[in-house]
């Protein structure tokens, strides 16, 4: 019998495992309504600040440029977003959520809220609130 104990997971491993688990659950819920986690994130960003350039989306969402382009292409193909020339620089495009995209986002927000509520039931509202606050501080410190 092996008596060596496995090393206790460190913060990076715990955050990575938690991210994978929560992302998988949210992605599964969104997929039931034809959505993706990345598409949801992009639409949320567009709803919060309409008229974002691709560079702004990449920076705000911490996505690689090609991934952001692929996600926006999918949203445009599904009529959930559209592109217009940037009024300040005609060489660039500005991405907007369409009316259909805003409607779909409202449904996706409800699905994500359901996943967040399940997490709150599992851990407790206070602990989830403290976790959100701590993670927000970490992200704000990095930006």
PLM regions and their residue ranges:
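A broad helix-preferring feature
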Residues: 23, 54, 69-76, 95
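Charged, amphipathic alpha-helical coiled-coil/dimerization segments
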Residues: 73-133
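C-terminal regulatory/oligomerization modules of transcriptional regulators
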Residues: 1-6, 126-143
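N-terminal leader segment of winged-helix/HTH proteins
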Residues: 1-33
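Short, locally clustered residues in the helix-turn-helix/winged-helix DNA-binding domain
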Residues: 19, 44-48, 109, 136
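Short amphipathic alpha-helical segments with heptad-repeat character
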Residues: 12, 16, 20, 62, ...
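N-terminal helix-turn-helix DNA-binding core of bacterial DNA-binding proteins
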Residues: 24-67
């Amino acid at each position: 019998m092996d008596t060596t104990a496995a090393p206790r997971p460190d913060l990076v491993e715990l955050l990575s495992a938690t991210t994978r688990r929560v992302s998988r659950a949210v992605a599964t819920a969104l997929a039931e309504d034809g959505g993706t986690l990345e598409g949801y994130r992009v639409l949320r960003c567009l709803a919060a600040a309409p008229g974002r350039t691709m560079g702004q989306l990449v920076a705000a969402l911490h996505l690689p440029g090609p991934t952001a382009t692929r996600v926006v292409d999918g949203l445009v193909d599904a009529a959930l977003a559209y592109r217009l020339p940037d009024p300040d620089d005609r060489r660039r495009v500005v991405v907007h959520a369409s009316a259909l995209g805003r409607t779909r986002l409202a449904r996706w927000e409800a699905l994500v809220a359901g996943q967040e509520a399940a997490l709150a039931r599992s851990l407790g509202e206070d602990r989830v609130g403290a976790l959100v606050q701590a993670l927000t501080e970490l992200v704000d410190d990095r930006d």
